[in-house]
From Swiss-Prot:
Gene behind this protein: rpo10
Function: DNA-dependent RNA polymerase (RNAP) catalyzes the transcription of DNA into RNA using the four ribonucleoside triphosphates as substrates.
NCBIfam families: PRK04016.1
Name of this chain's protein: DNA-directed RNA polymerase subunit Rpo10
Gene Ontology CC annotations of this record: cytoplasm; DNA-directed RNA polymerase complex
Keywords on record: Cytoplasm, DNA-directed RNA polymerase, Metal-binding, Nucleotidyltransferase, Transcription, Transferase, Zinc
Family as reported in the entry's similarity comment: Belongs to the archaeal Rpo10/eukaryotic RPB10 RNA polymerase subunit family.
Main enzyme class: transferase
Length: 65
């Protein structure tokens, strides 16, 4: 799956927040604090970023048949 571009529920654009969210969480920062700092208040938008799993780099390693 590619990083989320919009919230699946309300449609709010989230793509511009993905890189900062992902970098800060990977550095060990608390996801709740990161989401609060990014200004995401709606639980649907928070869920979209929290549950996103980017598997494209893994899939890209396989050769076409």
């Amino acid at each position: 799956m590619l990083p989320p571009i919009r919230c699946f529920s309300c449609g709010k654009p989230l793509g511009h927040l993905w890189e900062e969210f992902n970098e800060r969480v990977n550095k060990g920062e608390d996801p709740k604090k990161v989401l609060d700092d990014l200004g995401l208040e709606r639980y649907c938008c928070r869920r979209t970023l929290l549950s996103a799993v980017v598997v494209f780099p893994v899939i890209a390693k396989f050769k076409k048949v």
